[in-house]
Amino acid sequence: MNSAAILPQTTSAAAMIRTLGLIAAICGVIIVSAYQGTFDAVQENKRIAVERAVFKVIPAAKSIVEYSALPTDSVEKIGAGGTAPAGAVKFYAGYDEGGRLAGIAAEGAAKGYADNVRILFAYDLATSSITAFSVVAMRETPGIGDKILVDTEFLANFPLEAKVSADLKGLANEIRTVKHGSKTKPWEVDAISGATITSRAVGKAINDAAQALLPRIAPNLDKLKEKS
């Protein structure tokens, strides 16, 4: 009888590394393939969601044309779901049944309590005011942060004054959120008591986007007034 111990075969470190590398590569290919396979569908769903939000904040709109406001203070059309060029600001022009401009809509975002609060707001050129907003995405605390959607006093902030300054460098007055009950100016947002951070996010998102966009739109009103 052979008394020599039978030792199990060992796997070298190099072989283990090769195996793990192969597994990682296969997993990577699967993940990339899944991402590429669903990318178009995800983007289309996002486009549809934003389009619905535009119709919500501009009720008179029956059709939408997507534009980009360029750093040169000109505007140009972009395809549906398209991306604005570098340095440009994307916006949506809503037109009524007669092809007349019913309002402008644009996205904005700012840090909320849990994460960024992404909104889409409507701007009326005749009154130089933000008339409404809709939430595109947020992760605020249910029952607290999401009060911005239903709180009647908060929604009464709109229309919100957003006049462009005479020199077209920005807004005549910064849109800012103030403590609940202390609003005295038409460009101030009266915060929700207990949801101040989310309220501030809405005000900042609107202000930052409006400061960048509206001065570029002002010189191009004639181009936007009629759907072409």
Model-derived regions, located:
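Flexible, solvent-exposed loop/hinge segments and secondary-structure transition points
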Residues: 2-228
